[in-house]
Amino acid sequence: MKSYIAKAQEVERKWYVVDAAGKPLGRVASQVASILRGKNKPTFTPNVDCGDFVIVINAEKVVLTGKKLDQKMLRKHSLYAGGLKETPYREVLEKKPEFAFEEAVRRMLPTGVLGRKMLKKLNVYRGAEHNHAAQKPEVLELRY
């Protein structure tokens, strides 16, 4: 019996809603990255984008454990000497919680064209409302 290899045209995609309120950022992000990649499906093929669409709500209520709010830094560099800018995650989560969540998921996905394609299926919202009711998303309960 031959192994099944998924083709891009045959992949059926579902829509899921994940509530991130009160849950650790890394744990939610790792499960969302797995769904975006399609690893929860028996037809997973590494070289095909076979993941589902994910809507994350309540991104502003996500939690960082321990002292990470003050000690973990978001780093960006201007490529000039001395151009490293560091921002504590406390400020990032106050100003742009959607960006913090998307960045955590992006770093868990493959780099390259396929990873960027997977990331486009992620929709993150600060509050509890989203505008994807027409897609009839299923509520997804996370494992932990």
From Swiss-Prot:
GO terms for cellular component: cytosolic large ribosomal subunit. Keywords: Ribonucleoprotein, Ribosomal protein. Gene3D superfamilies: Ribosomal protein L13 (3.90.1180.10). One of its GO terms (molecular function) is structural constituent of ribosome. Pfam families: Ribosomal_L13 (PF00572). The keyword Ribosomal protein applies. This protein is one of the early assembly proteins of the 50S ribosomal subunit, although it is not seen to bind rRNA by itself. It is important during the early stages of 50S assembly. Part of the 50S ribosomal subunit. This is Large ribosomal subunit protein uL13. It comes from Clostridium perfringens (strain 13 / Type A).
